[in-house]
Design a protein with these regions (language model features):
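Non-catalytic structural scaffold of enzyme domains
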Residues: 1-272
Length: 272
């Protein structure tokens, strides 16, 4: 069996991808991980597909400069806009977050009614409903845009007791309750931090974390393709952002639920 010491690259529009990154770190402690959060251009979910694809290409180009062995797009919006493009253009495996969450939701639902909470861009592309129905044509799928969830979470507000969070979750979950979904896909990697608030509004529904499901798939790909690092290697982590290092450092520990393990550096993503 071969081993591959090259790092894994992970990117998101901002901080949200750290939820999937954390799961990946827990599953693969022997892998070197490089995270890029495009904090200077967050959110992606309110932008057009061409702009999102441009940003995703720049993010991928930056990470490819480290000689990565796999690219993990820990951003639902970027997956909707650019995953297929990057998979065709890059010489390494490219993993997203949509398909694995969809498969888990199909297995989870009992009444065949699945709701997807996502950014406006992801909803507009209908990538979740299309893929879910390709797996199970009998499903009823509601795609609910949650335009303000990402800015609120990036601002550090996600407590279920926060009045702004309560107003937003009540508004966005009302159609979900009326729809009768028994399974909700958190179709943005920022949303797991809002899980307690979402569960408060939809207590009967199972919540599917798209980033966590995808991280499990990434681990399986490494094993299948012989890309795992040496078994005795202790993996390291590095973080890069396109805006304030201080703001990222202050908020990242909330997403990771522990202090940052590696250095953080600001880069000019427009150069890539």
């Amino acid at each position: 069996m071969g081993y591959d010491p090259r790092p894994i690259g992970v990117f998101d529009s901002g901080l949200g991808g750290l939820t999937g990154f954390q799961k990946l770190r827990a599953l693969l402690p022997g892998e070197d991980l490089i995270y890029f959060g495009d904090t200077g251009r967050v959110p992606y979910g309110t932008r057009g597909r061409d702009i999102i694809t441009k940003y995703a290409r720049q993010d991928a180009s930056f990470l490819m400069g480290f000689g990565i062995k796999l690219l993990f797009i820990a951003c639902n919006t970027a997956c909707y806009a650019a995953l297929d493009t990057l998979a065709q253009e890059l010489p390494v495996p490219v993993c997203g977050v949509i398909e694995d969450a969809s498969r888990r939701a199909c297995a989870q639902t009992h009444n065949g009614r699945i709701a997807v909470l996502a950014t406006a861009a992801t909803v507009s592309g209908h990538v979740y409903s299309d893929f879910l129905k390709s797996l199970r044509p009998d499903l009823c799928v509601l795609e609910q845009p949650c335009r303000l969830f990402v800015p609120v979470v990036e601002a550090g507000r996600f407590s279920k007791e926060d009045p702004i969070v309560r107003i937003l979750t009540q508004e966005y979950l009302a159609p979900v309750r009326a729809f009768g979904a028994d399974t909700i896909i958190l179709g943005c990697t920022h949303y797991p931090l809002l899980a307690p608030a979402i569960a408060q509004e939809a207590p009967e529904a199972a919540l599917i974390d798209s980033g966590a499901e995808a991280a499990v798939h990434v681990a399986s790909i490494l094993a299948e393709k012989g890309l795992s690092n040496l078994p005795d290697h202790k993996g390291g982590v590095r973080y890069y952002v396109s805006d304030s290092v201080e703001d990222f450092t202050g908020s990242a520990s909330i997403f990771l639920q522990h202090p940052l393990e590696g250095p953080v550096e600001r880069i000019d993503i427009e150069k890539f």
